[in-house]
């Protein structure tokens, strides 16, 4: 159990740092599009989780430490629903209702599509 906790923790740090780097870069280069980093990491994270899930289904021998580390730790640290919610609220409060609705729709449906695509890639 301690090995699983360590794997999740270490991979979570990596995912979180990658999300932080994406947010920092977007804020520095495109401050008007602050939400783009959250959108990107959530869509990419959905693709990654789909691929990992498909791989782990076909390879049950992969140790639980690796599975949990990558899915719960890395992807969990990389993606974030709370930031998505805050970004959407900020857009709504600033009167950018169409953009907020588009962002929310793309995030949800894009995430579902990316997860499906990732899983499908493992079935080729």
From Swiss-Prot:
Single GO molecular function: metal ion binding
| Annotated Na(+) binding sites | 76, 79
Q: Which reactions fall under this protein's catalytic activity?
A: fluoride(in) = fluoride(out)
- GO annotations under biological process? cellular detoxification of fluoride
GO cellular component assignments: plasma membrane
- Which Cys pairs are S-S linked? none
Activity control note: Na(+) is not transported, but it plays an essential structural role and its presence is essential for fluoride channel function.
What exactly does this protein do? Answer: Fluoride-specific ion channel. Important for reducing fluoride concentration in the cell, thus reducing its toxicity.
Question: Sorted alphabetically, which PANTHER family does this protein's record hold?
Answer: FLUORIDE EXPORT PROTEIN 1-RELATED
Q: Which family does it belong to?
A: Belongs to the fluoride channel Fluc/FEX (TC 1.A.43) family.
Question: What's the protein here called?
Answer: Fluoride-specific ion channel FluC
């Amino acid at each position: 159990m301690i090995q699983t906790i360590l794997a999740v923790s270490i991979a979570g740090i990596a995912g979180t740092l990658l999300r932080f780097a994406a947010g920092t870069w977007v804020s520095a280069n495109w401050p008007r599009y602050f939400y783009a980093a959250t959108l990107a990491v959530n869509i990419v994270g959905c693709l990654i989780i789909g691929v990992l899930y498909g791989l782990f289904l076909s390879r049950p021998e992969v140790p639980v430490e690796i599975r949990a580390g990558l899915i719960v730790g890395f992807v969990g640290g990389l993606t974030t629903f709370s930031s998505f919610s805050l970004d959407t609220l900020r857009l709504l409060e600033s009167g950018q209702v169409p953009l907020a609705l588009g962002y929310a729709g793309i995030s949800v449906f894009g995430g579902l599509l990316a997860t499906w695509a990732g899983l499908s890639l493992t079935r080729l």
